[in-house]
């Protein structure tokens, strides 16, 4: 079995880009096409089985609607477990500042001028797609939003998430993390098959998934065993991403932080469901505010967490969520007109803050190394360079901390001066790899090893 490891040794102290056919072929060479096809087929069978269970339940309960709308929140019956409907629920300048992404964007202090040009990210959303006609997506004369499946319904949620990712900055306060990237807009009616197609056809590096199963849905509390469990949804995502090691799926942690239920691991914790507990996904929590110094350092050693952000850990003790982004009162694109904007709060907003920032880090890594990071490398880079949110070290609230795009970019650039090391290696059972490093003593020596 081949495992890939990253060693990122982090010492604290204008590029151009085009994704070429050669680069796309290099990404595709890492894919296990047979396994991708098999996982997609299995998930299609799971989708058919879920649809049968939901259809039968709705026939027996005609007063219950499959999709319900409450303000900007959408809840859709996803499955029936133990006779109970399981709901799937919808979970930019301030966001960029919080994760220090403004340092690596155009005009940032690092003079990197990263914009995500000629790069792509796709999103899956409950209930509808992105308003592609919005001015923020039409700055080039044609929309940078591409619809990947059928259906014409647009939603505020999808449009807001898309803006956080790729809004051009016509309104500077609503500028997205990667304002020149293109975006594929899908609904969650089907995920694995179109995602696999995107990965194979477009060498897709990143996807954003701001949805999930809440602890308390329209029909009450989800079965207690679901919270923190490594269930079939989590396993399916791990299988898919193992076959596509270049692709990182970013998930919102959920907004069940204030919900109470009996039988959890600890009061206030154990509120992550399904794919949020997958090993290979990146699960994002929601910070409400942070005080930063001029160099992007966290002042007073505290990142304020939004109380609604769902906490881990997983039932088997792994650190989840993985990372924290800014998702409180985020100003982004809206619906109703092509110049509509508005604020929104939730891990649905912090996830695209993180996903779009990682897209820029992939752009930078390719500029400096002529290749893109594997998903595990990108994940370790983000987690290994994050700013502690409260207590030192990882925890079930912040994960590894608040994303620090500036520190991550410095780590990529630091390889040239040997102040950092990013290494992707294959390691067989029983083998060992040895890296000799020298710590200067005045700053922390940090390592992150994923597989």
Regions found by a protein language model. Name each.
Residues 19-22, 92-207, 216-218, 243-248, ...:
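Subtilisin-like serine protease catalytic core
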Residues 21-23, 168-172, 185-280, 291, ...:
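Substrate-binding/access-modulating region of protease and related hydrolase catalytic domains
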Residues 324-392:
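Hydrolase catalytic cores
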Residues 446-451:
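Short amphipathic, basic-aromatic surface patches that mediate peripheral association
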